[in-house]
Structure formats: C-alpha cells, structure tokens
C-alpha cells in the first residue's frame, strides 16, 4: 500500500480560525445532524461552525488526532523525538525530570 493511500484513509481535523472550534470527523456534529466518520470535505456547502456560525472557508486543516506535531518534512530531523506525539513527549520530559529528581535525592544517602 502506498504512502499516499494511507494518508487518505486518515480523517483530518479542521479548526475554525474565528473561534477555535475543532471539527472532529470521528464525532461528527450532532447540532447539524452530521454523522460520525464524515470527512470535512463531505460536509454540506451550507454547513457552518456550530459555535460562531463561520463558513467552511474559515476552517484550516490541523491534521489527524494523535499524530506528531509539526511539518511532515521535518519529522526526520533530530534524535527521533520529532516523530513522537505530544503525549509521548510529555512522558519523556516529565519522566526524565522525575529520574533526575530521584538521582539528586539519592545523593543524600551518601556518607
């Protein structure tokens, strides 16, 4: 299966630039009777933001949920940390802080 075919199966989220509302295709839009798993491109032309009633043109693609943040072309740089999701980065950062704290506390045990 090609990379392009894989990208098309993922449902991208779209964010309203006016109010910050995020349309998530997995949930749909119960206010306008939009079924779950409906891609943004298949929404009716007269669909508007449920919060501020902005048109579809006011939305920008923010990508699928749970993916690495940043531009796709930059994910290969660095030590591999760029490919981690935000939740994985939080675990890495706070885990390292906790280990560092435990290390410095363990120095009190030295005589």
Swiss-Prot record:
Sequence ranges assigned to domain Rubredoxin-like in this UniProt record: 11-62
Cofactor note: Binds 1 Fe(3+) ion per subunit.
Residues that bind Fe cation: 16, 19, 49, 52
Species assigned in the record: Trichormus variabilis (strain ATCC 29413 / PCC 7937)
GO molecular function: electron transfer activity; iron ion binding
Record function comment: Rubredoxin is a small nonheme, iron protein lacking acid-labile sulfide. Its single Fe, chelated to 4 Cys, functions as an electron acceptor and may also stabilize the conformation of the molecule. Could be involved in hydrogenase-linked redox processes.
Membrane-traversing stretches: none
PANTHER family: RUBREDOXIN (PTHR47627), RUBREDOXIN-1-RELATED (PTHR47627:SF1)
Name recorded for this polypeptide: Rubredoxin
BP GO annotations: alkane catabolic process
Cofactor(s) needed: Fe(3+)
